[in-house]
């Protein structure tokens, strides 16, 4: 799949843009704070209806603006799509081929995009919440069921935690209602965890292959999922996972009431990246961590292709300068002829021109884009 046209109105500092893209490689050059990252964020939002930089959609509406409008023309192997997202201060709406969608889950997945930025190193060395967000965003865009269960889990979790707080403060007494919420949450959690195990198995396989390709070394990369309910295993059925989570909720009921929060479940789970069985967070060098982060992104590309039969867009936000020539070459060779790629950079030095042949180059300044070089 590829995005051949993008329209942007009032997205951060991008006031009004109409841009045609090359189906292969598009490079955007410009100084910092001119709008390069905002452009990739706009494409990412068009695909996933959420930002990788903020949890508040209001932050995306340009200064003095009342709304943000994004529209894209997408070419897929079997179909052509017109996608649109409208963000207002009251919320957001989405359209597919000019038909408004009642649910975001019907929209997400029409356009797949994988983003790689310098912040992705935090995926290996950062907090568990970053890795959980990674799973929900990346798996949600390729599987509608995962997206549904992740959204439903958040809703019921908030409801249960609010009720736990009422119990903790003595404003509620009925623990039967708490049991109902725990049972409902355990059922949704089981569906979510089952799918996480499944997707991480695929991702680990592809990431291991990609790491070998990038590092040219003998180390083996693997990904392990660590449920907060420790007796859950990858071989469990959804019914077995449900029962184990419900047992955990029941065992910890008094503690949860006292703390006013749910102490176990998918919102407390984590994933671990290992090199030869050792925790990469603790033992990997910065170069190894960079290779792991890159391998995960390449694995995502393969996972999207496996599950959708389409290659996603690849958004490289100021990462080429972070990669040495060997890693650049490995990345570009890996994606060559597969993905439509968008690259932002402050200058063209350091780009592996022997691999990137005939890109379309744009210049970005103060939120406006001009075509600098046609391929």
Curated annotation (Swiss-Prot):
Pfam families: SMC_N (PF02463)
Subcellular location: Cytoplasm
MF-aspect GO terms: ATP binding; single-stranded DNA binding
GO BP annotations listed: DNA replication; DNA synthesis involved in DNA repair; double-strand break repair; SOS response
Entries under SUPFAM superfamilies matching the protein: P-loop containing nucleoside triphosphate hydrolases
Binding sites annotated in the UniProt record for ATP: 30-37
Keywords: ATP-binding, Cytoplasm, DNA damage, DNA repair, DNA replication, DNA-binding, Nucleotide-binding, SOS response
Domain of life: Bacteria
InterPro entries: DNA-binding_RecF (IPR001238), DNA-binding_RecF_CS (IPR018078), P-loop_NTPase (IPR027417), RecF/RecN/SMC_N (IPR003395), RecF_2 (IPR042174)
Cellular component GO terms, alphabetical: cytoplasm
Family per record: Belongs to the RecF family.
PANTHER family: DNA REPLICATION AND REPAIR PROTEIN RECF (PTHR32182:SF0)
Its biological purpose: The RecF protein is involved in DNA metabolism; it is required for DNA replication and normal SOS inducibility. RecF binds preferentially to single-stranded, linear DNA. It also seems to bind ATP.
Name the UniProt record assigns to this protein: DNA replication and repair protein RecF
Record organism: Lactobacillus acidophilus (strain ATCC 700396 / NCK56 / N2 / NCFM)
